[in-house]
Amino acid sequence: MNLGKRIISCIILLILLAIVWLIGDVNYGKIETMGRAVVDENSKKVALTFDDGPHPFYTKQLLEGLKERDVKATFFITGQNVEAYPEIVKQIFEDGHLIGNHTYSHTQLTSGNAERFKQEIIRTNEVIKEVTGEDTIYIRPPYGSWNKEFEKELNMFPVLWTIDPLDWCSNDASGIVKNVVVKVKENDIILMHDQYKTTVTAALEIVDQLTKEGYEFVTVDELLFD
């Protein structure tokens, strides 16, 4: 996606969020469109998470930078990209990062597609296991849309976020970094997307700056349950 389209998409998303805020909560019955991460506030840890990947080039760059810094992250990947780039998924796994489900085709849960959404989760779990040999229990539902009934039905734990620097609609790495470092606090979950060069640059700079400030980067399972 080029910069112009990314900016337009970002503006549209912000307008939609503003409309929702003005008219009040949208009720989809048992569907939750937003959520809050529940975290332990007793340690100075943060989790860096990446959605939508892997990317054939930028994810490799990111993995190299994280390995150089001895930092572990969490990657919520789509089933389509697992099938397209299994060798990168294997590298993510072998490097010690946590892998989570992001549906097969980045499908958002709505009031009318619950069965399709569920099948995308199941299919993605299957293709991830084919590559890593391990089951996946963490999911980041696209756009934060989730149905609590799926947690027991599919044995999946949803992971949302506390900081979103909107890296996917920016070509300004320094601005992305600033959006994170001025807001971050212990136990935050940072949302980013490993599909863009600017994200890789920004993510590694975020790691460098927050490490100097005494933060420890952990995977989301460590943050939520250790």
Language-model features: locations:
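Active-site beta->alpha N-cap acidic-glycine motif
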Residues: 26-112, 116-117, 123, 127, ...
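Catalytic domains of cell-wall/extracellular-matrix polysaccharide-remodeling enzymes
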Residues: 107-216, 221-226
